[in-house]
Each structure stands twice: as C-alpha cells, then as structure tokens.
Amino acid sequence: MATGPTYRVKFRRRREAKTDYRKRLKLLLSRKPRLVARRTLNHCIAQIVLYDEKGDKTVVSAHSRELIKLGYKGHTGNLPSAYLTGYLLGKKALAKGYTEAVLDIGLHRATKGNAIFAILKGALDAGMEIPHGEEILPSEERIRGEHIKAYAEMLKEQDEERYKKQFSKYLEKGLEPEKLPEHFEEIKAKIDSMF
C-alpha cells in the first residue's frame, strides 16, 4: 500500500467497489432522473432515482419478484424477466409522470445485448425516452426467450434426464420451457392491462 504525503484514500463507496464517482457526476450533470438498472444471479432491479443533497430519492421501482405476483413462472434472473421488469418500471414511471431518464448501469460491464440493456429495452417499449444506441439492445428473439426454448428442445431431444434437471424449477411451477415465449407474451399483456 502506498504511504507518504501524496497518498490519498479513495472514497469509501469507491473502495467497496459500489460507486464510480466520475460516471455518477456525468449522469447527475444531465439533470434528468436516472434509470438505475442492477442485476443479480436470480433477480433484476430497476429504479427511477432523483438526486438530492441529503441522499438520492427513489421515486419508482420494479423488482423481478413482482413478476411472480403477476403469475410469471420462469426464472427471475434471465433476459425475458429483465425485459419485463424494465417494462413494468416504464409503465409505473409514466403513470407517475416520469417520461425521460438516463441509464445508470453502475459498475456493470456494458456488454452488447446483456440483461441490463434488456431492462432498458423494456422501459423504452413502455414509452420512456432514454438516450441509447440501437446496436446495444438485445434482439427480439432473445427478449421473448426463443434461445431458452431452442436450448430446451435440443436438450429434451438429446438427454431427457439432463433436461429435467436443468429446467426442474420451470417444470415444478408447471411451465414447460418450450412455452416460455407464449408465457412471456401473457405476462406482458397483464402488465399492459394494469396501466
């Protein structure tokens, strides 16, 4: 560790790898609400956050657990659930009068077509205005879960036992992974009917 008079200790949240202050400052200078998109292995979280001197204020939020209450039977950490979480957030935000935002991905890596950008695509399709590049968004097939369907069909054909093990939670909940795209459309329609 460096010592001496020229050494400066970084801010606590930077040391804990929670905040990139340079990126945060650039986002705050836009003076727009931030669409904060975060992903864990099993869940997706999306929030509309406003800056305040005493601490940021979350005005609208959506969590992939809310999809379960709507009847979603798929995994809550995959690409279709990330899109639906963003879509739900977008509908909630528009209902509260927030029409535009800037995307805040925090310390997540900006990889083309990942779940963070599926959240963004969901918010855009709900009607929000968020600056973005079209090439970064995931394809419609991946958003609907066509890649999961194709993998499930291939696995069921080749190794029935592995198929049952891989998709045990889907089957336990009564959803065949081959029907995920249709199930996705049902949940999206339910979100539309709420607003």
Swiss-Prot record:
GO biological process, one term: translation
GO molecular function: 5S rRNA binding; structural constituent of ribosome
Keyword Ribonucleoprotein part of the UniProt annotation: yes
GO CC terms of this entry: cytosolic large ribosomal subunit
InterPro entries reported for this sequence: Rbsml_uL18_euk (IPR005485)
Ribonucleoprotein as UniProt keyword: yes
This protein's UniProt keywords: Ribonucleoprotein, Ribosomal protein, RNA-binding, rRNA-binding
Family: Belongs to the universal ribosomal protein uL18 family.
Cited HAMAP family: Ribosomal_uL18_A
Role of this protein: This is one of the proteins that bind and probably mediate the attachment of the 5S RNA into the large ribosomal subunit, where it forms part of the central protuberance.
Matches recorded under NCBIfam families: PRK08569.1
Subunit architecture: Part of the 50S ribosomal subunit. Contacts the 5S and 23S rRNAs.
Name this polypeptide is given: Large ribosomal subunit protein uL18
Gene: rpl18
